[in-house]
Amino acid sequence: MSSEPLVLGIETSCDETGVGIVRGHTLLADAVASSVDEHARFGGVVPEVASRAHLEAMVPTIERACETAGIRLYDVDAIAVTSGPGLAGALMVGVAAAKALAVGLGKPIYGVNHLAAHVAVDQLEHGPLPEPCLALLVSGGHSSLLRVEDVTSGVDPMGATIDDAAGEAFDKVARLLGLPFPGGPYIDRAAREGSTVYVDFPRGLTSRRDLERHRFDFSFSGLKTAVARWVEARERSGEPVPVADVAASFQEAVCDVLTRKAIDAASSAGIEDLLIGGGVAANSRLRVLAEERAAARGIRVRVPRPGLCTDNGAMVAALGAEMVARGRTPSPLDLPADSSLPVTEVLV
């Protein structure tokens, strides 16, 4: 098969129905249908609502991607789909659609890991991944540090959150501040008008004692609780809550820990390239702080454009294309949707 295979990727791990089409490392189409507005009134993603939205959006999104790419479905060399981790019902919709396409078109199918796909998508913007590289993946469901020797098979965890993920903390703090869902973009926007030192919020797992056991792990539940208590105390006193200042101080605490641990992990492993991905990677302060700290340690930083950081089908197609190009054996047609798929299992 061609070293630049034409691959269609399907992503349905959470609330975005994503269909991407790539040829090798070239992005041809990235169609996304989001159900975020349906979840906003609940203040978070509702699994049943997400699954139903995927069912409704799947065919139109596939059609839109093919039209944008200027191809017909039977032109593709392979189908790739997120098999996990994610919401079980949502994953099942994507996997079922991918299986139907694979059978109907007579094409191989590749069930891939959602987290590894967040790493692979960077190739669409910056070319082949340096190997090894360190990946910092931060989203609503994950906060992980990964050593990547080979994005198709050699992904090993160095650290992860022990409680709340960074993106989850952003959503919960946004709710405390009266900001809309999803909270990340709104906190980022509000923080631009605030002071990063207005409140000295705690940095989880950064004490000397914590670093002995959790050097590269994250914890954001304590930070979330600290913000809640600060806001509640302010409201009890009858004083207005300075939303911009609290947003900036909270965001600084998160970005400080993420970048500090990522740079430390890369340095300790002798890795000179840091890749940042996941929805929180779109945060402007995280990008700036990572660049500053990495430059001071001689580490190069790669961050995809914001549209490729959030969940999308292009990242799945990118990883699928890499699987095909490297001659990986396709997945069986009975591949499962695995909501707790470990990152070490890149191909199902």
Curated annotation (Swiss-Prot):
Pfam name, any one: TsaD
Main subcellular location of this protein, as a coarse class: cytoplasm
Any GO BP: tRNA threonylcarbamoyladenosine modification
Cofactor note text: Binds 1 Fe(2+) ion per subunit.
Residue numbers binding Fe cation: 114, 118, 311
Entry similarity comment: Belongs to the KAE1 / TsaD family.
Entries under NCBIfam families matching the protein: gcp_kae1 (TIGR00329), T6A_TsaD_YgjD (TIGR03723)
Its biological purpose: Required for the formation of a threonylcarbamoyl group on adenosine at position 37 (t(6)A37) in tRNAs that read codons beginning with adenine. Is involved in the transfer of the threonylcarbamoyl moiety of threonylcarbamoyl-AMP (TC-AMP) to the N6 group of A37, together with TsaE and TsaB. TsaD likely plays a direct catalytic role in this reaction.
Protein name according to UniProt: tRNA N6-adenosine threonylcarbamoyltransferase
Organism: Nocardioides sp. (strain ATCC BAA-499 / JS614)
Organism phylogeny: Bacteria, Bacillati, Actinomycetota, Actinomycetes, Propionibacteriales
